[in-house]
C-alpha cells in the first residue's frame, strides 16, 4: 500500500482516482500531477515504482494539502467571524451564507426541524 502525504492510497485504484484520497487533490489536480510525473492515469497504484511514488510526492509537496489546507480553511472562517461581516455572522448562526432562502429549506445548515409545539410554549 502506497503512503503519500500521510495517507494510505488504495493499491487497486488507478493513479488518477487514488490521488483524490488526499484532501485538497481532486480529479483535475490529480491529472496534472500524473502528467508532470509522466505517469498514465490508468496505471494502478500497486504498479507504480518507488521512483514514480517519489516523483508524485515531490509534485504534491508544491500544493497546500491535508492538515495545512484544513487549518487554512478553518482560519479563514474564523477570520470572517472575528471581523463581524455578513458571512461570518451567518457562519456563527449556522445559516446559509450565499443568499439561499431560509423560511423553508436550508435543512442541511439548520439541522433537524424543531417541534412546532415546543416553539409555541
Swiss-Prot record:
Q: Which Pfam families match?
A: Ribosomal_S13
Q: Where is this region: Disordered?
A: 94-121
- Single GO cellular component annotation? cytosol
Q: Which PROSITE patterns match?
A: RIBOSOMAL_S13_1, RIBOSOMAL_S13_2
SUPFAM superfamilies (alphabetical): S13-like H2TH domain (SSF46946)
UniProt-listed GO biological process terms = translation
* Subunit and interaction comment: Part of the 30S ribosomal subunit. Forms a loose heterodimer with protein S19. Forms two bridges to the 50S subunit in the 70S ribosome.
- Which protein are we looking at? Small ribosomal subunit protein uS13
